[in-house]
């Protein structure tokens, strides 16, 4: 069982685009979409007058996430949408925790991270130093969403990040960025009964998940398989959703 970004999941299942495996990976199926992940761009506050859009990061030290990660793929695509290549920046491939540490140490100017918000590393960083999250321009987001389908499937959407998620965002000025859904996938080797019980436990624990992390409040069973493309539901998950009155096709 794993949680994956839907864009990466569909690429893996169909061996699309920048997915560098020798063949498609079809040994898994979907348990359910659970929450939204947003593309977060964190910037040192002393750069606020100069870094107003992603186009302004040229010449800076930028972490684009772990090599081969969904964050790295998202960062490269977003930078390209603003006319920035990796040759225009000093690239670092750091995890979110290492990015936050490097920024605190004065060794990094900007970092990307795709995840549910809030993210602990960013929440803790904003208490240690002044930072801001960079919003994206509407026109660029519209073009990005239109031009970055995964195969035939639209997986990206505009999403807001607010003061309730990060105190460094003004209460009266939420930012808008690009989001993608995070999905639980399971091995096809698991039985129908096993995955049925796992799916049932997930959705019956929704309120407890929300108490543990804010992303749980956005869980909606009606969106459990909306943007999974051609990746199939596991039969056990499909059985549960059918019992809940959802049309699994």
What are these regions (language model features)?
Residues 202-220:
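Periplasmic-binding protein-like
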Residues 134-197, 248:
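C-terminal lobe and pocket-closing loops
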Residues 1, 77, 97-111, 123-127:
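Short helices/loops that flank or line small-molecule/ion binding pockets
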Residues 3-17, 96, 112-119, 137-138:
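Beta->alpha turn/N-cap motifs
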Residues 86-104, 116-118:
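Short helix-initiation/N-cap motifs at beta->coil->alpha
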Residues 12-29, 121-138, 144-164:
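Ligand-binding "clamshell"
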Residues 48-61, 235, 239-249:
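Immediate post-signal peptide segment of exported/extracytoplasmic ligand-binding proteins
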Residues 1-58, 66, 73:
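Short, glycine-/small- and polar/acidic-enriched structural segments
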């Amino acid at each position: 069982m794993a949680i994956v970004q839907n864009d990466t999941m569909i690429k893996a299942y169909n061996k699309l685009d920048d997915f560098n495996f020798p063949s498609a990976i079809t040994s898994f199926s979907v348990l359910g979409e659970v929450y939204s992940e947003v593309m977060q761009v964190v910037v040192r506050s002393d750069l606020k007058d100069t870094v107003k859009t992603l186009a302004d990061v040229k010449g800076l030290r930028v972490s684009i996430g772990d090599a081969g990660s969904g964050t790295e793929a998202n960062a490269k695509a977003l930078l390209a949408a603003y006319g920035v290549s990796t040759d225009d920046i000093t690239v670092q491939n750091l995890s979110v925790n290492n990015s936050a540490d490097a920024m605190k140490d004065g060794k990094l100017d900007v970092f990307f991270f795709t995840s549910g918000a809030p993210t602990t590393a960013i929440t803790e960083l904003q208490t240690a130093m002044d930072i801001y999250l960079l919003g994206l321009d509407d026109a660029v987001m519209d073009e990005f969403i239109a031009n970055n389908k995964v195969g035939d499937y639209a997986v990206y959407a505009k999403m807001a990040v607010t003061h309730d998620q990060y105190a460094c965002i003004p209460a009266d000025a939420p930012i808008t960025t690009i989001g993608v859904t995070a999905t639980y996938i399971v091995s096809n080797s698991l039985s129908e009964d096993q995955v049925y019980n796992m799916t049932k436990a997930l959705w019956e624990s929704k309120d407890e998940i929300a108490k543990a992390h804010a992303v749980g409040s956005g869980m909606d069973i009606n969106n459990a398989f909306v943007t999974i493309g051609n990746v199939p539901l596991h039969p056990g998950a499909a059985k549960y959703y059918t019992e809940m009155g959802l049309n699994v096709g």
